[in-house]
Amino acid sequence: LAKIKDILIIVNKGQLEQYKKILPNGKKLGIKITYIEQETPKGLPDAFILGEKFIGKSNISLILGDNFFYGQFLSTKLLECINLKKGAKVLLHRVSKPEKYGVAKVKKNKITLIKEKPKKFFSDLAITGLYFFDNKVVKFAKQLKPSKRKELEITDLLNKYKKRNELTADYIGRGGAWLDTGS
């Protein structure tokens, strides 16, 4: 797992014991798994607020639980997260139906526009469920205001980095695969 030995899994209220049965503590895998139970769904950025103590001064990778990644690229990308100097990086993948995903427009590896499920086409680069952040992510997540859905939105968090010109793009390379089981 690309030198990653500490993993935080955030679970919905009432699901903690089910997860612990499947992945008790990670000892057999040579990792340490920490669990936090989220009382109510408050959006993806809430994971950083809940995990503040776990994150500390480290960079962090967020992998959505309903996304499946396959290929050797994953270890390489996770290593890059460890070495991320500043900012955030989003893993993108070309899709045939961008209206089903969060989508990004990119210029010279910098993300210039992000929209969630756009009605009008502007890019076919879907934002996969793999994100990399420096340790400012907790501070930025705490600054967010809930959306109309009464949740903190990942696009708002990414836009904080974009405004600082610190949001970059990366791609699933040849031989890699991504499946969003939630879409």
Map each language-model feature to its residues.
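Conserved N-terminal catalytic core of the sugar/cofactor nucleotidyltransferase
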Residues: 1-64, 68-76
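Conserved beta-strand termini and adjacent loop/short-helix elements that scaffold enzyme active sites
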Residues: 36-38, 91, 170-172
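Conserved hydrophobic/aromatic beta-strand scaffold that supports enzyme active sites
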Residues: 90-92, 103, 130-132
